[in-house]
Every structure is written in structure tokens, then in C-alpha cells.
């Protein structure tokens, strides 16, 4: 099996209509509800007099399966239908926001998350979803508003603390970011995601020895991921330790990709601190915003 040519991206294919309907069949069987003879996944209404329209719970299961499977168009349609049935429930609006954000419709996602918060002002998934959407639009100062409210209610939530750290890093407030990551590690010692983000923040501050000390035990562990190893390679590259960066790169990448990354690290070293921060954050902020909850 050949080596991978990259480690950051991960694509999830869309369901075909047939696969989506198969999921619906399974969910209906699990929920013990009557199944229409023909089901249109976009309208999710009974056809040919074969049964009553699905319930709110069934719609939420269908929409959730579509969202997980990457079938965002169906997820959006079904979450909207669920919101029509239970207009006071925040959950359909949160799911709708997640699906819209996944398609790049960030402004619509912001509206959806705010709709959820209008129904439950302390809903953590809605608060973090809204913060991630604001980060997507390059407005970390707005992201801090729902995150600060969430922190007051959940001060020991590691996922929330890491998202706060990412937001502070995007604002250029690296010391504050490191404080959040450090708090997160107190509640989740050895957490790889927190270690990666803390190490990157330390590197952005120019403290390469501390960054390496934080990340090296995680990246060199037997269970380490390619992302963790290549983040350590990036930090070595930023410090100018080309041999170490190349050695780590070759664990996961082919030679052409290693050479490409080494050239990129050299380019980063030649940038101003502000431009270097922007370049590094552009390849890490999306990961942080997408993957943390």
C-alpha cells in the first residue's frame, strides 16, 4: 500500500439516493413506525396513500444520518421540515446550522444557530456552532461572545476550552490561547488535540523549544496520528531543523510531498511574523473550528 500524499484533508462522499433511502428504511424499522410505500427524501411525505408523514423524531434521525453521511442537501431539507413540526425545539436549527455550514452557507448557518439560541439561550451546541461559523467568516471577536457565555456555564469543558484557545490564536492573543489550552489539559491530561493546539500556539509565539516539548511525546507515541507527526514536522521546519522535519515527513508522505513541505517551511521562515501567523492559522484554524465541539 503506497504512502499517503497528504494528511490534513478528509473527504466524505455523498450518499446516493439509494443509500440514503436504505438508511431511512433502517431508521424506520428501528423506530417501529409505518413506512410509506414511496418516500421522497426531499419532501419526506407519504406517497400514494401509503402512510402518514413521519414524526419529528423520525425526521431528526433521517436528517442526522444524512448529515453524518455528507448528504447535506437532504439534511438541510429534512431539518427544516422537522423545525416546522416542532418550531420551539432548538435541535433542528442546530442541525440545520451544521449542515449549512458544511456547504459553505455560513451566513445562513449563523441565522440557524441564532434561531436555536432564541429558543434556548444556554444551548452549548448552538453556542459553539455559532462561534465556529463566526470563525469561518474571520470574525473571532464575535465568536468570543457565545463562547464566553458557554464558558460561564461549563468552565471545565475541554472541547470548549480548546475552541476558546483557537479563537484567541486567530485574534493573535497567543498567551491567552495557551492559558485556555493549559486549562483544557488539566481536565483532559494527554489529550492529543489539546497538545497539538498548544504546541502550535507556542510556535506562533516563537517558543519552539516549549512547543516541541509539548508535542513530541504525543507525536512520537505508537498511537500517534499522521496529523500529530506532521504538525511536529511543521514546528521543526519553522525552527529551521530541516533534517528532523524531513525525517518525520517521510513517515507519512512520499518524497515529493516531503520536498514540497520543506520548501514551504523555508517560505514561512522568510515571512514577517504577522504574515507567518496568518499562513499557519489558515491551515490550522479550519481544523480547530470544524473538529471541536
Positions of predicted regions on the chain:
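Bacterial Sec signal peptide processing site at the extreme N-terminus
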Residues: 28-54
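Terminal, low-structured helical/coil segments at or just beyond the last alpha-helical repeat
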Residues: 37-42, 222, 228, 232-293
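Alpha-helical segment of the N-proximal tetratricopeptide repeat
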Residues: 52-91, 95-102, 136
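Helix-start (N-cap) detector for alpha-helical repeat units in TPR-like alpha-solenoids
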Residues: 55-56, 90-91, 124-125, 140, ...
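Structural signature of tandem alpha-helical TPR/SEL1-like repeats
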Residues: 69-77, 102-115, 137-149, 171-183, ...
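Structural marker of alpha-solenoid helical repeat scaffolds
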Residues: 85, 119-120, 153, 187-188, ...
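Canonical tetratricopeptide repeat
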Residues: 95, 129, 163, 197-198, ...
Amino acid at each position: 500500500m503506497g504512502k499517503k500524499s497528504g494528511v490534513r484533508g478528509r473527504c466524505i462522499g455523498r450518499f446516493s439516493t439509494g443509500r440514503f433511502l436504505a438508511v431511512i428504511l433502517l431508521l424506520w424499522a428501528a423506530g417501529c413506525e409505518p413506512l410509506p410505500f414511496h418516500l421522497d427524501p426531499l419532501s419526506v411525505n407519504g406517497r400514494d396513500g401509503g402512510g402518514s408523514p413521519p414524526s419529528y423524531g423520525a425526521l431528526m434521525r433521517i436528517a442526522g444520518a444524512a448529515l453524518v453521511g455528507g448528504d447535506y442537501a437532504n439534511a438541510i431539507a429534512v431539518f427544516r421540515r422537522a423545525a416546522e413540526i416542532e418550531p420551539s425545539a432548538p435541535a433542528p436549527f442546530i442541525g440545520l446550522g451544521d449542515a449549512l455550514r458544511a456547504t459553505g452557507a455560513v451566513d445562513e448557518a449563523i441565522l440557524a444557530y441564532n434561531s436555536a439560541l432564541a429558543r434556548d439561550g444556554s444551548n452549548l451546541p448552538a453556542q459553539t456552532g455559532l462561534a465556529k461559523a463566526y470563525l469561518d467568516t474571520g470574525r473571532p471577536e464575535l465568536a468570543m461572545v457565545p463562547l464566553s457565555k458557554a464558558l460561564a456555564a461549563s468552565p471545565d469543558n475541554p472541547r470548549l476550552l480548546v475552541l476558546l484557545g483557537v479563537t484567541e490564536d486567530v485574534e493573535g492573543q497567543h498567551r491567552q490561547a495557551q492559558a485556555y489550552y493549559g486549562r483544557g489539559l488539566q481536565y483532559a491530561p494527554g489529550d492529543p488535540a489539546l497538545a497539538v493546539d498548544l504546541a502550535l500556539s507556542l510556535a506562533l509565539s516563537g517558543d519552539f523549544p516549549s512547543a516541541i516539548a509539548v508535542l513530541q511525546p504525543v507525536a512520537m507515541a505508537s498511537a500517534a496520528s499522521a496529523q500529530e507527526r506532521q504538525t511536529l514536522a511543521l514546528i521543526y521546519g519553522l525552527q529551521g531543523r530541516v533534517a528532523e522535519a524531513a525525517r518525520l515527513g517521510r513517515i507519512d508522505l512520499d518524497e515529493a510531498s516531503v520536498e514540497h513541505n520543506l520548501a514551504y517551511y523555508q517560505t514561512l521562515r522568510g515571512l514577517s511574523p504577522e504574515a507567518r501567523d496568518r499562513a499557519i492559522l489558515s491551515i490550522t484554524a479550519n481544523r480547530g473550528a470544524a473538529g471541536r465541539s
